[in-house]
């Protein structure tokens, strides 16, 4: 079991903890598939809803909040039945807008894993307005069920009445809907090819600034992030922040980063290079490789 879970595992009911420990191996990064979840539910003699709430301390253990020191864990349940953990991330000494909220982390985890719809969000603190707006961008977002400890479950529409969302800006394919943009780039670099694929899967209906970041660590592992825009603009999730959230979920340190690549469309209304460099230079002595590509 990873050291970061030693304290949080003691907060779980013993039968659930015993069943969960084998999953918390060195490569565990917060994903539990539907079959594993069913086994946890059976072994613990709890309902699935009870298990998901009980797992929140494990999700919160993924957090990296050096500024607030407030650990928030979230779990996104996909339509597939799989669950995806996420946690808040703050960059030391950097502006607060670089922060990643736990709900964003969990949703991006699900998106990067191929989920096309989120049906439930479980979180240990009431979603802030920023996160409510972020969730409203999702496929059938208004009907996502929000679960909080010791509170009744409600749909997102309950938490965000009279919402402004993608439909108000004539966007018919919301975040997580299957869509892809093709780009032209001649490269044999596996890291750049990976970034190009993720840029094509990014979500930028408001600026057309499709983009992705790939981070490579000293052992050759790569961690990707995609741009995820929002109808309200400010709650948009930048690809560097998504990549850093991905990296920390995998229990890697910022000091492990040896290479960073940003790929973005030449036809976008904005560029993410400045914000991406700001975040990168805060946490790693690595120069950003910036590649601009043309859509097909």
Curated annotation (Swiss-Prot):
The keyword Protein transport does not apply. Signal peptide: none annotated. Gene3D superfamilies: Cytidine Deaminase, domain 2. Substrate binds at residues 88-90. Zn(2+) binds at residues 101, 128, 131. It holds the Pfam family dCMP_cyt_deam_1. One of its GO terms (cellular component) is cytosol. GO terms for biological process: cytidine deamination. InterPro entries: APOBEC/CMP_deaminase_Zn-bd, CMP_dCMP_dom, Cyd/dCyd_deaminase_Zn-bd, Cyt/Deoxycyt_deaminase, Cytidine_deaminase-like, Cytidine_deaminase_bacteria. Keywords: Hydrolase, Metal-binding, Zinc. Binds 1 zinc ion. Coiled coil: none annotated. GO terms for molecular function: cytidine deaminase activity; identical protein binding; zinc ion binding. It comes from the Bacteria. It catalyses: cytidine + H2O + H(+) = uridine + NH4(+); 2'-deoxycytidine + H2O + H(+) = 2'-deoxyuridine + NH4(+). Its cofactor is Zn(2+). HAMAP family: Cyt_deam. NCBIfam families: PRK09027.1. Homodimer. This enzyme scavenges exogenous and endogenous cytidine and 2'-deoxycytidine for UMP synthesis. This is Cytidine deaminase.
